[in-house]
């Protein structure tokens, strides 16, 4: 009887500790300041309050750090999910939510010639085995000084991609990021997106200078010098995208 109790407790505990989160990353591409105003009002006053009412938390809203002359601008909404069903259920809830519909009227009812964005994409991700839960960054800088770095690593084939995921997990890359205090928010593989096979992860810094110092420590570390030269990990990344982001003042983190 006692043995069964401990077995059940162990099963329950392992389920809580090792259950992988899902993430939804919504990317808005737009060109004008008017679109940005509508997007911000929608996210701040309609979408995030609705998601909070539904019990979702730790929602991140970020704007791509770019030159003022950049034509195509980008905004990201990061949402942790328990499972894929959450992704499907949210839309159904929003359709029936009168408070959301009223607060987001300018966005939801925009005419086809005056949409709040040029294009929108949704990326679904599954957390890595050695980073199954997102972590809120421990930063003290004001939000307008922080830098969140979102990276996407693409691989040539699914098999090669699996090798890069292994390198992050069992290979020790995540451990190195932890040791060097990169304040990672998440590490995950993309399960639905336009650049597969690929993984994405987000790290965070107090400011740009702090980011540069952390990456110098990373590339100079003996662990990375050894890991990056191991023959089994060569050519496992075919393309890298680096997005430097600033959190909006209404972002949860």
Feature names for model-found ranges:
Residues 1-8:
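Bacterial N-terminal signal peptides
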Residues 12-101, 105-106, 110-224, 234-253:
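Short S/T/G/P-rich N-terminal loop/turn motif that feeds into the first structured element of a domain
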């Amino acid at each position: 009887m006692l043995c069964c109790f401990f077995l059940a407790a162990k099963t329950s505990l392992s389920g809580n500790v090792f259950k992988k989160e899902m993430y939804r990353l919504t990317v808005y591409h737009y060109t004008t300041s008017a679109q940005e105003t509508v997007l911000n009002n929608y996210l701040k006053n309609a979408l995030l309050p609705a998601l909070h009412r539904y019990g979702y938390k730790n929602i991140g809203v970020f704007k791509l750090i770019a030159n003022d002359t950049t034509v195509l601008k980008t905004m990201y909404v990061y949402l942790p999910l328990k499972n894929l069903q959450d992704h499907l259920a949210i839309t159904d809830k929003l359709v029936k939510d009168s408070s959301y519909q009223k607060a987001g009227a300018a966005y939801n009812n925009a005419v086809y010639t005056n949409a709040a964005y040029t294009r929108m994409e949704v990326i679904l991700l599954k957390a890595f085995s050695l980073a199954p839960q997102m972590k809120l960054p421990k930063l003290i800088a004001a939000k307008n000084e922080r830098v969140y770095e979102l990276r996407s690593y693409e691989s040539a084939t699914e098999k090669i991609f699996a090798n890069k995921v292994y390198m992050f997990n069992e290979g020790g890359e995540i451990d190195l990021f932890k040791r060097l205090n990169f304040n990672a928010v998440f590490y995950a593989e993309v399960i639905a997106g336009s650049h597969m096979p690929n993984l994405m992860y987000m790290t965070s810094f107090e400011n740009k200078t702090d980011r540069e110092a952390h990456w110098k420590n990373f590339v100079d570390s003996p662990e990375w010098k050894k890991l990056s030269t191991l023959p089994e990990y060569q050519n496992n990344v075919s393309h890298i995208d680096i997005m430097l982001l600033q959190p909006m003042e209404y972002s949860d983190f």
